[in-house]
């Protein structure tokens, strides 16, 4: 069986749940084709251990595609990331109490890595399912960006395609506030559409997905 590895994060910043994992775990075992299956795994939300855990999973599972996901506070849609940057600049401590500021993700690495996923086709597929989606130009500077960067760094010399998706809060996480959210079933459907499009699309669509600022 060929494997697509899909990851989400454990809860952080005193939240009891992380929607990325709650959504990803629903896709465990889903088949994208007769011989292609999603394997879902959870990553720690910690600079010291997240990348190592992801590397371990890649070594164990030998996936043909890897898509990491995480919570994007303030996001209102399925946000498919374009680029990871070589900087850690944590606004809050991670789950091990570490808060790196202006440090390199990989001192020997380039300034940035682009995703190798067909992000325009993925956005089109999610929107085609009636779910809000967009290409995102920044994955932040917390553990999500670090994992995204380390993922691309690890697979840069391989044929394994990889990238990162941010998801919104769940409605129950933002009760009484004006912050955007997305129902879990909608999130799951959006991720499924995105992952399926990523698997089925060898060459990305040529259409606008940028931002003015």
Swiss-Prot record:
**What binding partners and quaternary form does the record give?**
Homotetramer.
**Which function does this protein serve?**
Removes 5-oxoproline from various penultimate amino acid residues except L-proline.
List, alphabetically, the GO terms of the cellular component aspect: cytosol
InterPro entries, per database record? Peptidase_C15, Peptidase_C15-like, Peptidase_C15-like_sf, PGP-I_bact-type, PGPEP1_Cys_AS, PGPEP1_Glu_AS
Reactions catalysed according to its record: Release of an N-terminal pyroglutamyl group from a polypeptide, the second amino acid generally not being Pro
Q: Name one GO biological process term.
A: proteolysis
Q: What is this protein called?
A: Pyrrolidone-carboxylate peptidase
The active-site annotation reads: 81, 144, 166
GO MF, one example = pyroglutamyl-peptidase activity
Q: Which gene encodes it?
A: pcp
Q: Where in the cell is it found?
A: Cytoplasm
Q: Which family does the similarity line name?
A: Belongs to the peptidase C15 family.
Where's it mainly located? cytoplasm
Which UniProt keywords are given for this protein, alphabetically ordered?
Cytoplasm, Hydrolase, Protease, Thiol protease
Instruction: Tell me its EC number(s), please.
Output: 3.4.19.3
């Amino acid at each position: 069986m060929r494997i697509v590895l899909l990851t989400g994060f454990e809860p952080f910043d005193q939240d009891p749940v992380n929607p990325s994992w709650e959504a990803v775990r629903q896709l465990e075992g889903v088949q994208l084709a007769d011989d292609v299956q999603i394997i879902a795994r959870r990553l720690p939300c910690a600079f010291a251990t997240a990348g190592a855990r992801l590397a371990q999973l890649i070594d164990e599972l030998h996936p043909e595609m890897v898509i990491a996901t995480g919570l994007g506070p303030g996001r209102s849609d399925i946000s498919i990331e374009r680029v990871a940057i070589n900087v850690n600049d944590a606004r809050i401590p991670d789950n091990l109490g570490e808060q790196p500021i202006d440090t390199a993700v990989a001192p020997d690495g380039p300034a940035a890595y682009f995703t190798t996923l067909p992000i325009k086709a993925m956005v089109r597929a999610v929107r085609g399912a009636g779910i809000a989606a967009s290409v995102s130009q920044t994955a932040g500077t917390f553990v999500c960006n670090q994992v995204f960067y380390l993922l691309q760094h690890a697979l840069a010399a391989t044929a394994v395609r990889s990238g990162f998706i941010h998801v919104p809060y769940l409605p129950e996480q933002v009760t009484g506030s004006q912050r955007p959210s997305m129902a879990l079933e909608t999130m799951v459907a959006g991720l499924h559409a995105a992952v399926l499009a990523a698997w089925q699309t060898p060459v990305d669509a040529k259409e606008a997905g940028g931002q003015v600022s």
